[in-house]
Curated annotation (Swiss-Prot):
SUPFAM superfamilies: NAD kinase/diacylglycerol kinase-like
EC number: 2.7.1.-
Catalytic residue positions: E268 (proton acceptor)
Organism: Pseudomonas syringae pv. syringae (strain B728a)
GO-annotated biological processes: phospholipid biosynthetic process
PANTHER family xrefs: LIPID KINASE YEGS (PTHR12358:SF106), SPHINGOSINE KINASE (PTHR12358)
Name this polypeptide is given: Probable lipid kinase YegS-like
Amino acid sequence: MTQRRAMLILHGKQALNEDVRDAVADKRKQGWELDVRLTWEAGDAQRLVSEALAAGHRHIVAGGGDGTLRDIAEALALAETSASLTILPLGTANDFARAAGVPLEVSKALQLMDVAPRAVDLGEVGGKLFLNMATGGFGSQVTANTSEDLKKVLGGAAYLFTGLTRFSELHSAHGELTGPDFHWRGDLLALGIGNGRQAGGGHELCPTALADDGLLDISILPAPQEVVGTLRSLLEGGLGIDNMFIRARLPWVELKSTQGLDINLDGEPLSGEDLRFEARPGALHVHLPADSPLLGGAPKLNRPD
């Protein structure tokens, strides 16, 4: 019988979470040898993954938000290990988990430890890996709230422009995207490059993305002058602009902008004038629901731990 052994790497803020304590106790009663380690500062997740693998663990549970999940997923992929990952979503947005159908209730999420893992892709850019999505919004100043008027107009892209209170504050950047049989150049307001489907707390920028197809979904919100100039009339007419996105599905895409680009990788900032995004097919083994919307039919791996 395969030894049921795992390590839960838990964000330090969740140390006193009674639901987590109860769920861990339940898994131990079910026969799991489940160790728990806490993160305290930047770099801890990566260090704890290394320690877990060195100790012989082949199953890691990521307990935290999208940032914690990204850190642990990246560390596992860079270790080139066959160890698998269970997602325990404890953050505010939990964008990848929600899109993947992972339960938000702690005990139900940990039930996925007992299902077979699936091979899923990662995205890579600038030497960094991401599980969910790379996003970019231009001319935005991030604060706590987004104008309700802008939300009505921008729909799923609204969170990229957090802090804008007037239409005159919308600014675009000139960008060029190139990939296999794909080329687009122009002014853009927003960009999503997704392995997952949503970002910013439930905004579906890449609504049909699959995490196991070896491809990245590209969503561009163009900003020709006539579009920027008519946002107010779009609002008055009750129209959103989600349907104005240009979309593609590519194994890689190069993004260039002489103005520089501010990119968010599941909470990790990245900037540059010339960036290449690539899919890393099957780079991670994740325990997901059999009916996860992010799975397109790739075969199950032959074990749960």
